[in-house]
Amino acid sequence: MISDIKKILYATDLSPNSAHAFRYAVYFAKKFDAEIIILHVIEGASQDAVKALELYMDKQYLKKTLEKREDHAVERLKNRLRIFCDKELTDDPEFVEKIGSIEAYRGYPAEEILKKTEELNCDAIIMGTHKRSSTYTFLGTVAKRVLRRARKPVFIIPLPKGMTDLSFYDD
């Protein structure tokens, strides 16, 4: 039996083209009357990088700096969501209420996406691919790992050829 999709995890890398994959998350949320959880994972620094930083910063300052980075990612996501809604959801301003939460974590992206999908009881995962060149779209290692290990449906959204959508661009 196919289970209902009531909660969608939309994983974003904050690239300007991520609006295209978010459109699919919005489409599915409307179609299934589902909630969207927006997730961004900040790749953790390598152990070598952390050790090098600790030579120049005390651990408390380093911890605060990393926390600020997470807060900044959440603020960027909120700003992008506002821009997207203002631009593309003028006919449905109440849709914003379907956004359950905006989450940002440090870690390995594929592992965090899979972990949060289970923790938050999401029924599906939506994420985009990276554009590698004008001749083909590259399915990134994060998408491959999620696709291989997920126990929920995963929708990988390719970027159409030549598309450069700056709907999320906020820099």
Please place each PLM-identified region on the residue numbering:
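Small/aliphatic-rich secondary-structure junction motif
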Residues: 2-64, 171
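Short, solvent-exposed amphipathic alpha-helices that sit
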Residues: 24, 73-87, 112
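A short acidic, glycine-rich active-site loop
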Residues: 59-79
